Curated annotation (Swiss-Prot):
Xref: InterPro entries: BRCT_dom (IPR001357), BRCT_dom_sf (IPR036420), Homeodomain-like_sf (IPR009057), Myb_dom (IPR017930), Rap1_C (IPR021661), Rap1_C_sf (IPR038104), Rap1_DNA-bd (IPR015280), SANT/Myb (IPR001005)
Residue stretches spanning the membrane: none
Subcellular location: Nucleus; Chromosome, Telomere
Subunit and partners: Interacts (via C-terminus) with RIF1. Interacts (via C-terminus) with SIR3. Interacts (via C-terminus) with SIR4. Interacts with a GCR1 homodimer.
Protein name: DNA-binding protein RAP1
Residue ranges annotated for the HTH myb-type domain, each copy included: 355-415
Source species taxonomy: Eukaryota, Fungi, Dikarya, Ascomycota, Saccharomycotina
Length: 827
């Protein structure tokens, strides 16, 4: 746990009460100090009192003083009944003999306790502990934090779990700033604190509550209180006629007390007692002022609301107070001994359960000022999550996320100033040792991208593409090909270099345009780029390239930036490029692309847009009915022998296509293909409205029932255009196939075979279906860009006459791409 010194702040009420001298002792009764040499006798007499007269311990301190005076008058030696916490801590465990004169033994336990503590510290602090790290994007500041936590856990004897536990287990915890699993969860700060102190710390202040935490705690505490109340009633009925001064009870029940005390004694050491006092202090600060107390005599004690029960046997209200008090005001050692085990087990739950729930607690002025003070002294961490997680340990009524939201939405306007820090985030002081205030915010750990950074990234990517394509250094113009190249470098060069490139014919770097080139680009590029431009991490630069630069266009942003600079205007960084376009229609929860939900909305869609003819309406309605009945299509029709043979005959699978960059073309080939495509309008200008829907060739071995939900061929083609125009990377062939299946109802094996026929050219994808539906032939013959089995055989034969026919049909660019498919064994 981070100490207040880390923040150089923290009001006194947020400081852990680790020193017994800091514990607030109620001033209702003066503490009586016993001589140090009679500590064992004091402890023994207290144990006798508590065992022989359980019902009488709730009498007020004034009655205890009167008892002591009466005992003095009767010359009866009685131990002190009220001790300070320090006396209770130092009192040794005593074995009490009978009143006939047996000696009192006082074993020394200081050495034993010290040995136990040494044994605990000697081993790794996280030994036998297992942790599962929450790797959600909002759980940590960066992936480096997760890796650091994993290394710390393993280095200190702990184990990192690969999968989230399904149920609560001993010594198994989840590490996360929030708890949405209802499993034992600790904050990342707990791991760091244990490793820093080289000991296993008490995790009660690091536990993260579940959403329904208050309800669970209250129910468990009420059950415990109810059971205590039943025992109390029985005790009261047995002793209702025996309530008298404590000295009489001790004298008449000494034998029973001796038997019980000799068998059950637990030493309360100083640290445990201090922690008890700390919890009592926290509970007193945050308990509701409306807490009900049955006796009304101890208004400053924390109470647990109990269910109604029969109190006919309770003749004395003070007797009923005993079991209702969560922490007794006089801190009686015997009571602490008897309830120590159960209290320690549920102490963290009690301390948090008695507080207001997190989603309802309001921030006080003191808490707001405390948060502002911490942020002012840690200005570079103001946008992180870990800072507010650490603050939550000093503001126990709120979680780290709620504190972060509080600062960002409300308190950031009141920040006004921060304290100066150096480049490492450490506070800077003046000559007098005072902190230096400033209104200039230092750059935070998480920074936004600037236009200069976007331009630098675009130029670097363009240079990398230039090197890969022509093997020429864009800065010096020298060739990168040498006789000393390793086989690995040669193989990599062959994958990226333009095979049709003639050395010396390449354009200069200023005239070169990336066009639609999207990759490939190795991770090493971003690693080296992040080392040269340390303002952002490697992953941040890579995401900036993938999600922003590719979407904007490399050439487009370079042109925009240079044009703005030429006009003496300040260019803007790339933004608003990651917002997903809104889908048409009313979204439904869950998988709203499923066929079953589309079928439920089918009737309303049909009313809005009528179908072209009655036949298509009947077919679509039948498909919708089939979908609503979990695809009640005969199994032999869905998985017939021909379909299975078709699937097994495919030599290429999704992984091969994914690894072969099916959508990526070298620059020269791409230009040739685009040139041919622009002269083939006759194959694309087919009016979809002239094609009846569903077409005769559309069978269930090629399409899912979802396909038949479309009202017309135009609707299907519009959806197809929407899917293939998405932002797909060269390695995302499998994602494209899955999206086609989910959005248009094209079976995965069918779309995979189409990609093979098209050599991965998505521009020809709509052409394939238009000609297939129009001519009722699959695949469509004599269509440029669609390779049939006969075309492939002609290409493999190397017959010059056949090659000339293929060039005339498909063009030279597609010929080169098809050859690459053969070379990579994708056909």
């Amino acid at each position: 746990m981070s100490s207040p010194d880390d923040f150089e702040t923290a009001p006194a009420e947020y400081v852990d009460a680790l020193d017994p001298s800091m514990v607030v002792v109620d001033s209702g009764s003066a503490a009586v100090t016993a001589p140090s040499d009679s500590a064992a006798e004091v402890k023994a007499n207290q144990n006798e009192e508590n065992t022989g007269a359980t019902a009488a311990e709730t009498s007020e301190k004034v009655d205890q003083t009167e008892v002591e005076k009466k005992d003095d008058d009767d010359t009866t030696e009685v131990g002190v009944t009220t001790t300070t916490p320090s006396i209770a801590d130092t009192a040794a465990t005593a074995n009490i003999a009978s009143t006939s004169g047996a000696s009192v033994t006082e074993p020394t336990t200081d050495d034993t306790a010290a040995d136990e503590k040494k044994e605990q510290v000697s081993g790794p602090p996280l030994s036998n502990m297992k942790f599962y790290l929450n790797r959600d994007a909002d759980a940590h500041d960066s992936l480096n934090d997760i890796d650091q936590l994993a290394r710390l856990i393993r280095a200190n004897g702990g184990e990192v779990l690969d999968s989230k536990p399904r149920e609560s287990k001993e010594n198994v915890f989840i590490v996360s700033p929030y708890n949405h699993t209802n499993l034992p969860t600790v904050t990342p700060t707990y791991i760091k604190a244990c490793c820093q102190s080289n000991s296993l710390l008490n995790m009660e202040n690091y536990l993260v509550p579940y959403d329904n935490f208050r309800e669970v705690v209250d129910s468990r505490l009420q059950e415990e209180s109810h059971s205590n109340g039943v025992d109390n009633s029985n005790s009261n009925s047995d002793n209702k006629d025996s309530i008298r001064p404590k000295t009489e009870i001790i004298s008449t029940n000494t034998n029973g007390a001796t038997e019980d005390s000799t068998s059950e004694k637990v030493m309360v050491d100083a640290e445990q007692q201090a922690r008890l006092q700390e919890q009592a202090q926290l509970l007193r600060q945050h308990v509701s002022s409306t807490a009900s107390i049955t006796s009304g005599g101890h208004n400053d004690l924390v109470q647990i609301e109990q269910p109604q029960k029969d109190t006919s046997n309770n003749n004395n209200s003070n007797v009923n107070d005993e079991d209702n008090d969560l922490l007794t005001q006089d801190n009686n050692p015997q009571t602490a001994d008897e309830g120590n085990a159960s209290f320690q087990a549920q102490r963290s739950m009690i301390s948090r359960g008695a507080l207001p729930s997190h989603n309802k607690a309001s921030f006080t002025d003191e808490e707001d000022e405390f948060i502002l003070d911490v942020v002012r002294k840690n200005p570079t961490r103001r946008t992180t999550h870990t800072l507010y997680d650490e603050i939550s340990h000093y503001v126990p009524n709120h979680t780290g996320n709620s504190i972060r939201h509080r600062f960002r939405v409300y308190l950031s306007k009141r920040l006004e100033y921060v304290y100066e820090v150096d480049k490492f985030g450490k506070l800077v002081r003046d000559d007098d040792g005072n902190l230096i205030k400033t209104k200039v915010l230092p750059p935070s750990i998480k920074r936004k991208f600037s236009a200069d950074e976007d331009y630098t990234l675009a130029i670097a990517v363009k240079k990398q593409f230039y090197r890969d394509l022509f093997q020429i250094d864009p800065d010096t113009g020298r060739s990168l090909i040498t006789d000393e190249d390793t086989p690995t470098a040669i193989a990599r060069r062959n994958m990226t270099m333009d095979p049709n490139h003639v050395p010396g014919s390449e354009p200069n770097f200023a005239a070169y345009r990336t066009q639609s080139r999207r990759g490939p680009i190795a991770r090493e590029f971003f690693k080296h780029f992040a080392e040269e431009h340390a303002a952002h991490t490697e992953n941040a630069w890579r995401d900036r390239f993938r999600k922003f630069l590719l979407a904007y266009g490399i050439d487009d942003y370079i042109s925009y930036y240079e044009a703005e600079k030429a006009q003496n205007r300040e260019p803007e960084p790339m933004k608003n490029l990651t917002n997903r376009p809104k889908r048409p229609g009313v979204p439904t929860p869950g998988n709203y692309n499923s066929a079953a939900k589309r079928a439920r909305n089918y009737s309303s869609q049909r009313n809005v847009q009528p179908t072209a003819n009655a036949a298509s309406a009947n077919a679509a309605a039948a498909a919708a009915a089939a979908a609503s009945n979990s695809y009640a299509i005969p199994e032999n029709e869905l998985l017939d022998e021909d379909t299975m043979n078709f699937i097994s005959s495919l030599k290429n699978d999704l992984s091969n296509i994914s690894n072969s960059l099916p959508f990526e073309y070298p620059h020269e080939i791409a230009e040739a293909i685009r040139s041919d495509f622009s002269n083939e309008d006759i194959y694309d200008n087919i009016d979809p409205d002239t094609i009846s829907f569903p077409p005769k060739i559309a069978t269930t071995d090629l399409f899912l029932p979802l396909f038949f939900h479309f009202g017309s061929t135009r609707q299907f083609m519009d959806k197809l255009h929407e899917v293939i125009s998405g932002d797909y990377e060269p390695s995302q062939a499998e994602k494209l196939v899955q999206d086609l299946c989910d959005e248009t109802g094209i079976r995965k094996n069918f779309s995979t075979s189409i990609l093979t026929c098209l050599s991965g050219d998505l521009m020809v994808f709509p052409r394939y279906f238009l000609n297939m539906f129009k001519d009722n032939v699959n695949p469509p013959p004599n269509v440029p860009g669609i390779w049939t089995h006969d075309d492939d055989e002609s290409l493999k034969s190397n017959d010059q006459e056949q090659i000339r026919k293929l060039v005339k049909k498909h063009g030279t660019g597609r010929m080169e791409m098809r050859k690459r498919f053969f070379e990579k064994d994708l056909l």
